[in-house]
Amino acid sequence: MKGRCCTGKKIVEMKTGLVLEGGALRGLYTMGIVDVLTEQRIFFDGMIGVSAGAAFGCNYKSRQPGRVLRYKQRFAHDWRYCSVRSWLCTGDLFGADFGYHQVPEELDLFDFKTFYANPTAFWLVATDVETGEAVYRQATEGMHIDELCEWIRASSSMRIVSQW
């Protein structure tokens, strides 16, 4: 992998891995496949996700199939989730506080306990705004919930329609 790890550690090699790409609607298709993998109990030693792959891939590690579709359907028409109004009011097309904090912590609970207990290595990829290079961060048990959510947000950030 080209890029650097923000912790300064060497990126470890995995036995079996899953790459979850970004790309908005492609990410939803990917999550349908990942839900089936979860339901069939097909798991990997490690995975890496960028953008939608990071945002939705965390549900694979937390063993919550169907969660992405459920909250997408539930909040699709809520301006706080994704809208021009959200962009004008918060600076984010996808409301960052709503999507990365209120939904997983209050409205459609993310299973942080299972996520952190799962031994599957999960790498998040974001872009360094100064160099344009990929920055890799492994989501580990010691990572604070807020840090995890902010890394997923950074991975999913889109120029012009995101604050950062």
Task: Describe the residue ranges of each PLM region.
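Patatin-like phospholipase
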Residues: 1-50, 58-164
